[in-house]
Amino acid sequence: MIRLSLFISLLLTSVAVLADVQINIRGNVYIPPCTINNGQNIVVDFGNINPEHVDNSRGEVTKNISISCPYKSGSLWIKVTGNTMGVGQNNVLATNITHFGIALYQGKGMSTPLTLGNGSGNGYRVTAGLDTARSTFTFTSVPFRNGSGILNGGDFRTTASMSMIYN
């Protein structure tokens, strides 16, 4: 009988020491970036440019690039990062030639600057140049002269990185 009482007492005591524990659940809702131009580099070739024609409004090259976005909810954002020319226009990439850069615009034409930089982290909202039916984005590149500085002849180059994401 003493053993039975002791067993029941131990059983009741062990029930009394049970306590609630917290369950922590964590994760990350990951929005995958878009694949741009099938993962291939984008080449913008201006060929030969007459320095007298570099007036920030002529000689544009328009590119249509494919975009494949596995997640399409919200607005499309674009981030283009590279060396800016620092001329008060935040859409001009610097080149290796003094006073010469390449201005970028969303869409065809020069009405919507393609702002360079991180913006809000995802870049800047796409407001022109998006064709969702064809899954393409169009941008325009324009030779840019900073002020009235003399442009020396020679090969020029610049690079930038582009990413796009819906958010």
Curated annotation (Swiss-Prot):
General function of this protein: Fimbriae (also called pili), polar filaments radiating from the surface of the bacterium to a length of 0.5-1.5 micrometers and numbering 100-300 per cell, enable bacteria to colonize the epithelium of specific host organs.
Taxonomic lineage of this organism?
Bacteria, Pseudomonadati, Pseudomonadota, Gammaproteobacteria, Enterobacterales
Q: Where found in the cell?
A: Secreted; Fimbrium
What InterPro entries would the database entry show?
A: Adhesion_dom_fimbrial, Adhesion_dom_fimbrial_sf, Adhesion_dom_sf, Bact_Fimbrial_Adh_Pro, P_pili_tip_PapF
Q: Where is the signal peptide?
A: 1-18
Organism, per UniProt? Escherichia coli
Alphabetical keyword list: Cell adhesion, Fimbrium, Secreted, Signal
Q: Which Pfam families match?
A: Fimbrial (PF00419)
Tell me the PANTHER family matching this sequence.
Answer: FIMBRIAL SUBUNIT, FIMBRIAL SUBUNIT ELFA-RELATED
Superkingdom per UniProt? Bacteria
GO terms classed as biological process: cell adhesion involved in single-species biofilm formation
The name this protein carries in UniProt is Minor fimbrial protein PrsF
What's the name of its gene?
prsF
Record's Gene Ontology CC terms? Answer: extracellular region; pilus
